[in-house]
Amino acid sequence: MRNQHSLEEIAEIHSLLEDIKGEYEKGIRAVIKKNNPELFGNPHTIPKLQKIQINRGLGLAAQNTNILKKSINEFTAITGQKPIITRAKKAIAGFKIRENMELGLTVTLRGSKMYSFLTKLIFFTFAQIRDFRGLSVRSFDKAGNYTLGLKEQLIFPEIDYDDVDQTQGFSITLVFSSTAPKSRSKTMDRVLNGMVLFKFLRFPLNDSGYYDKYSSFSEVSQAWDRKKHLRRKRWSQE
C-alpha cells in the first residue's frame, strides 16, 4: 500500500541546482528512492521525463504562407528547434481538407533542449499566465503522461509583442518513461507516479491535496469511479 503523503516530500529538496536536469540526476532521484524504497528500490523504475511534444493546429490557416512562416519562426524561437509540418493523412471533403495538406506544426524535444524548455516553462512562463491558479492533476492520461494547453505565445520571453499579428496557442505534452514491473503498471499507479515526479520538479499543481486524504491507490481509483458515475447520472437526468 502506497502512502499518498509522499507527494509532499518535495520539501526535502532545499536548493535549485544549475538546471532541472542536474537537479533530477543529483537530487530528485536519490530523494525519491530514499522516501519510497518499496516503490523504487530499483533506480531504473524511477519515472523520468523522456520527451516533450509541442503541437499547434492551424487548420485551413496553414495554407496562408505568412501565417505558416510566422508560426514556424515562433516555434523555432521558443523551442530552439525547427518544427515539423503536420499534414492530413487522408482527404475529408466536409472540412475541405485534401490529402497531404498542411494542418499544423509539431516539435519533439529531448535531452538538453527538453530540460532547457522545461526550466523556462516552470520558472518563467507559468508566472506570465493571467489569473494562473496552478495545473490540474486531472490532465494526466492513462499512460501517466501530462498534457496542458496554453492560449497564447506572448507568455514566452522570446516572442516580441510587436511581431505578433494574432495570438495562437498550442498544447504541450510531457511524456514520462518508467520501467516499473507489470504488477505496478495500472493506470492509477502511472498517474500517481507522475504526480510524485511533478511535485519534485516544482510543477505548480493546484489540487494535489485532494489525494492526501486517501491512504491507498485503490481508494483513489474508487473515488474516481464514483465521480464518473455521478457525472453520468447527472447527464442522464438532463
Curated annotation (Swiss-Prot):
One of its GO terms (cellular component) is chloroplast. It is found in: Plastid, Chloroplast. GO terms for molecular function: rRNA binding; structural constituent of ribosome. InterPro entries: Ribosomal_uL5 (IPR002132), Ribosomal_uL5_bac-type (IPR020930), Ribosomal_uL5_C (IPR031309), Ribosomal_uL5_dom_sf (IPR022803), Ribosomal_uL5_N (IPR031310). The keyword NAD does not apply. SUPFAM superfamilies: RL5-like. Keywords: Chloroplast, Plastid, Ribonucleoprotein, Ribosomal protein, RNA-binding, rRNA-binding. The keyword Plastid applies. Disulfide bonds: none annotated. One of its GO terms (biological process) is translation. Pfam families: Ribosomal_L5, Ribosomal_L5_C. PANTHER family: 60S RIBOSOMAL PROTEIN L11-RELATED (PTHR11994). Belongs to the universal ribosomal protein uL5 family. Binds 5S rRNA, forms part of the central protuberance of the 50S subunit. Part of the 50S ribosomal subunit; contacts the 5S rRNA. This is Large ribosomal subunit protein uL5c. It comes from Trieres chinensis (Marine centric diatom).
